[in-house]
Amino acid sequence: MNNDINSSVESLNSACNMQSDTDTVPLLENGQSASNQPSASSSRGQPQASPRQKMQRSQPVHIQPLRRLQEEDQQLRTSSLPAIPNPFPELAGGAPGSPPSVAPSSLPPPPSQPPAKHFPPGFQLAKLTRPGLWTKTTARFSKRQPKNQCQTDTANAVSRIPTSQMEKLRLRKDVKVFSEDGTSKVVEILTDMTARDLCQLLVYKSHCVDDNSWTLVEHHPQLGLERCLEDHEIVVQVESTMPSESKFLFRKNYAKYEFFKNPVNFFPDQMVTWCQQSNGGQAQLLQNFLNSSSCPEIQGFLQVKEVGRKSWKKLYVCLRRSGLYYSTKGTSKEPRHLQLLADLEESSIFYLIAGKKQYNAPNEHGMCIKPNKAKIEMKELRLLCAEDEQIRTCWMTAFRLLKYGMLLYQNYRIPQQRKGLAPPFNAPMRSVSENSLVAMDFSGQIGRVIDNPAEAQSAALEEGHAWRKRSTRMNILSSQSPLHPSTLNSVIHRTQHWFHGRISREESHRIIKQQGLVDGLFLLRDSQSNPKAFVLTLCHQQKIRNFQILPCEDDGQTFFTLDDGNTKFSDLIQLVDFYQLNKGVLPCKLKHHCIRVAL
C-alpha cells in the first residue's frame, strides 16, 4: 500500500514540474511563448494537492496577467504612436549583447503627412526596458501636437493669400539716394513706390519741412545729364533704365509746377500755335495743353547738334504730341518738309549740366532727349540748345505737358487736395499769403492801412530803424562794454539753411538754377572780394542778381546793410526776416531759400 502511494506522489510531482517548465518558456520578441499555453480552467480541474504543490502551481498565475499587460502595451504602442524611423539601425541588426528592438514590419504604414522628428538618443532603449514610460512619452507627444497644428494652420493661412499680394510682399529693393552735400542713404522700398512717396519718406527720415517742393533727380555724371522725376513715376522702373554709374539725388525744385501757377508768363505768342482759336486766357491756355483732343504746337529756332559731329546747326523745330520735328526748308511746316527728330513716348528730356564744356554747345542752356534704356550710344542722344534760360524753360515745360498731359496736372493738385482734407486742428493757426500783407500805421489810437506807396516805404524804413534800436539795447545788455559787442551776431547766421558759406558766384548761380528759377529764390554767401562782407543771390524773372551786404558801425556797434546804411540790422537773420516782409531796395521779396539737407 505504501509503495503505491509513493509512486502516485512522484508521478504527480513530475507532472507539476513539467507544467512549471512549460509555463516558464522564454518569451519571443512579440511577447508569445514557444508552445501553446494551457488554459487556466484545465489547471484548476486538477485534484487538490499539498501546500507545496499549491506554491508551485501559483507561479503561472502571475505570468498570465504580465503577458496580458505586455500584449495590451504592444497594441497601445502600435496604435498611438506615429510611424517613426528607427534612429538606431545597428540595434535592429541583432548584434550580440544588444537589447532587442521593434521590427519595422510591426509598425503601421507611414501616413501621407510629413515625416515626424526622430526620437532623441536613448529613447528606443527606454521604451523596451521600461514599459511604464509609454504613458509619459505619449503625453509628451500630445503636448507638442498643438504647436505643430498651429504651424500647419499658419502655413495654410499664408497659402490662402493671393499670389499677387505675396509677390508684392517679397518684391522689395534697396535704393541709394544722395544729397547735395555728398551724403547718401540706402532706403528699402516696395517695387511700386512712386517718386513722390519716396520723397515724403526721405523728408520724414531727414526731419525736413514737407512743402511739396522736394524732388528726386535722375543724375548721369558721365553723360552730363539730369532731370527731375515726375511724382507718379515708379522709382524701380526708372532705376532699371539707368547705368551703374548713375544715381538719384534728393533736391528742392520750386519751379516744378510753376506753369500751373502762372501759365500766361511762360509761352510767348510766337512760340505757340493752336489748332483752334484761343482767346489767350489762363484757363483756356491750360485747357488746350491738358486736353488730349487738342493739338498745340510749340515752334521756334534751336541749336541742334549734328549726329556724329561736334558742330551745331540752327534749325526750325516743331514740338507736337507725336514727337519733335525739324524743318528741312526754312520755317516750313508742310509734312514733306518735316523730319522726325525724337519720339516723346519712349524718351525723356534732360538738362545739360555742362554742355558747353562736354559737348561744345553754343551756351549753357542745353537740353537732351534721351531714350529710356540703360545702354545707349551717343548717336541716340538728341542734343538741343536754346538762346536763353527762359526759352529753355518753355521747351522743357512743353515737352512735359505734351507727354504727360492731365497726369501732370493731377500731380500738381494732389498736395492741395490733401491740405483741404486735413483736420482743422492740424492746420496752422495763422496762414498769411504775401498778397494779404499791407502796411499799417499804429501811431494813433486806431490802426489804419497805409495806401500811399511813398508813406509805406517810409514806414518800412522807420521799422528798420526801430529794429536797429532794439538790437542795440540787447547788445549793450549782453556785452560788458558797448565798444566790444558780442561775437554771436557775427556768426549766428551760419546756423541757417539759407547761408551757404564760402562758395563762388558760379556755384551760387548753379544752385539757384537747380532748385528752380522762380521769383524770390535766394541764398546768402561769403563775399569773395570783401572778407567782411556778404552777398545776397536772388532770382527775379528767371534772372539771377547779386546784392552785397556791407558791415557798418554806429555808436560803436557793428551792423549790416543793403542800402548804404539807410536800413541797418544787427545780424543777418534780422536782415532776411525784414526783406521777407518788405521788398525795400530789392526787385522782389525773399520767398524761398536754397537748402541742402544731409541724409
Curated annotation (Swiss-Prot):
Highest taxon above the source species: Eukaryota
Subcellular localization: Cytoplasm
GO CC term (a single one): cytoplasm
Entry-annotated residues carrying Phosphoserine: 50, 98, 433, 436, 481
Domain SH2: start-end pairs: 498-594
Gene3D superfamilies: Phosphatidylinositol 3-kinase Catalytic Subunit, Chain A, domain 1, Pleckstrin-homology domain (PH domain)/Phosphotyrosine-binding domain (PTB), SH2 domain
Chain spans, region Disordered: 1-122
Biased composition (Pro residues): 97-118
Domain PH, residue spans: 295-404
Biased composition (Low complexity): 32-43
Alphabetical UniProt keywords: Cytoplasm, Phosphoprotein, SH2 domain
Domain Ras-associating: 171-255
GO biological process, one term: positive regulation of cold-induced thermogenesis
Entry-linked InterPro entries: BPS-dom, GRB/APBB1IP, Grb10_SH2, PH-like_dom_sf, PH_APBB1IP, PH_domain, RA_dom, SH2
Family: Belongs to the GRB7/10/14 family.
Entry function: Adapter protein which modulates coupling of a number of cell surface receptor kinases with specific signaling pathways. Binds to, and suppress signals from, activated receptors tyrosine kinases, including the insulin (INSR) and insulin-like growth factor (IGF1R) receptors. The inhibitory effect can be achieved by 2 mechanisms: interference with the signaling pathway and increased receptor degradation. Delays and reduces AKT1 phosphorylation in response to insulin stimulation.
Complexes and interactors: Interacts with ligand-activated tyrosine kinase receptors, including FGFR1, INSR, IGF1R, MET and PDGFRB in a phosphotyrosine-dependent manner through the SH2 domain. Poorly binds to the EGFR. Directly interacts with MAP3K14/NIK and is recruited to the EGFR-ERBB2 complex. Interacts with GIGYF1/PERQ1 and GIGYF2/TNRC15. When unphosphorylated, interacts with AKT1 and when phosphorylated with YWHAE/14-3-3 epsilon. Interacts with NEDD4. Interacts with LRP6, thus interfering with the binding of AXIN1 to LRP6.
Name of this chain's protein: Growth factor receptor-bound protein 10
Lineage: Eukaryota, Metazoa, Chordata, Craniata, Vertebrata
